Curated annotation (Swiss-Prot):
Binding annotation for Cu cation A1: 161, 196, 200, 207
Name used for this protein in its record: Cytochrome c oxidase subunit 2
Family that this chain belongs to: Belongs to the cytochrome c oxidase subunit 2 family.
UniProt cofactor note: Binds a dinuclear copper A center per subunit.
Record's function text: Component of the cytochrome c oxidase, the last enzyme in the mitochondrial electron transport chain which drives oxidative phosphorylation. The respiratory chain contains 3 multisubunit complexes succinate dehydrogenase (complex II, CII), ubiquinol-cytochrome c oxidoreductase (cytochrome b-c1 complex, complex III, CIII) and cytochrome c oxidase (complex IV, CIV), that cooperate to transfer electrons derived from NADH and succinate to molecular oxygen, creating an electrochemical gradient over the inner membrane that drives transmembrane transport and the ATP synthase.
Length: 227
C-alpha cells in the first residue's frame, strides 16, 4: 500500500505490475536523456555567440532530427504494445469474480459457486480497530487464491465507477450496461488496497477495495465456510 511522502509506485505484487514498473523506468530514462540534451543545447545557445546565419539548408541535420525521434518512439511503443497485449490476455482462469459498483459500495459474486456473493462497505472511522487503516478497511474482504489466474468481471448498477488496485496493476472501468474484464494474479499473500478511481458522487472517496490473497488451501476453507 502507499505511505506518506512516497515518491514511487507501490511494490509490485503481480507480473503485470512488474512489467509496468520496468516500462516506467525505461521510458523515464529516455525522457531524462532527451531533457538533458535539450537543456544542454539551450544553455549552449545562451552562453555562446556561435551562430550560423549564413546556413540556408542542412540536409544531414534534418535527416537526423527526423529519423532519431522515430527511433525513440519505436523504442517506447514496442514494450508498451507488448504490455498492452499481456493485460488483455486471459488463459484458463482458475476463478471468476464479478464486481459491481454502486453508490457507494461494491458487491462481489463468485460465479463458479452457486451462492457466494456479498456487499463490501467501508468501515466508518468510529468503528475501526487498532491497526486498521482509515478510509481503506471494509466489512467484507475479497478473498482470492494466490498464484492463480483470476478473471474479474466489472460493471456498475448506477453511474460510472472504476475498480482499481495499484499494487496489482489493475484499473478497470465499471460502466452501467457493459461488462469489462481483466485478470489478476498475485505472487505473494497479503492484503492489497484500492479505491474507486472514477468520480461517482459525494461519497466517491468512501468506496475502498480490499483483496486478501491467501494460499489455495485457505481459500478453499474460506469458500466452504461462506456457502
Amino acid at each position: 500500500m502507499a505511505y506518506p511522502m512516497q515518491l514511487g509506485f507501490q511494490d509490485a505484487t503481480s507480473p503485470i505490475m512488474e512489467e509496468l514498473l520496468h516500462f516506467h523506468d525505461h521510458t523515464l530514462m529516455i525522457v531524462f536523456l532527451i531533457s538533458s540534451l535539450v537543456l544542454y543545447i539551450i544553455s549552449l545557445m545562451l552562453t555562446t555567440k556561435l551562430t550560423h546565419t549564413s546556413t540556408m539548408d542542412a540536409q544531414e541535420v534534418e535527416t537526423i532530427w527526423t529519423i532519431l525521434p522515430a527511433i525513440i518512439l519505436i523504442l517506447i511503443a514496442l514494450p508498451s504494445l507488448r504490455i498492452l497485449y499481456m493485460m488483455d490476455e486471459i488463459n484458463n482462469p482458475f476463478l471468476t469474480v464479478k464486481a459491481m459498483g454502486h453508490q457507494w459500495y461494491w458487491s462481489y459474486e463468485y460465479t463458479d459457486y452457486e451462492d457466494l456473493s456479498f456487499d463490501s462497505y467501508m468501515i466508518p472511522t468510529s468503528e475501526l480497530k487498532p491497526g486498521e487503516l482509515r478510509l481503506l478497511e471494509v466489512d467484507n474482504r475479497v478473498v482470492l487464491p494466490m498464484e492463480m489466474t483470476i478473471r474479474m468481471l466489472v460493471s456498475s448498477e448506477d453511474v460510472l465507477h472504476s475498480w482499481a488496485v495499484p499494487s496489482l496493476g489493475l484499473k478497470t472501468d465499471a460502466i452501467p450496461g457493459r461488462l469489462n474484464q481483466t485478470t489478476l494474479m498475485s505472487t505473494r499473500p497479503g492484503l492489497y488496497y484500492g479505491q474507486c478511481s472514477e468520480i461517482c458522487g459525494s461519497n466517491h472517496s468512501f468506496m475502498p477495495i480490499v483483496l486478501e490473497l491467501v494460499p489455495l488451501k485457505y481459500f478453499e476453507k474460506w469458500s466452504a465456510s461462506m456457502l
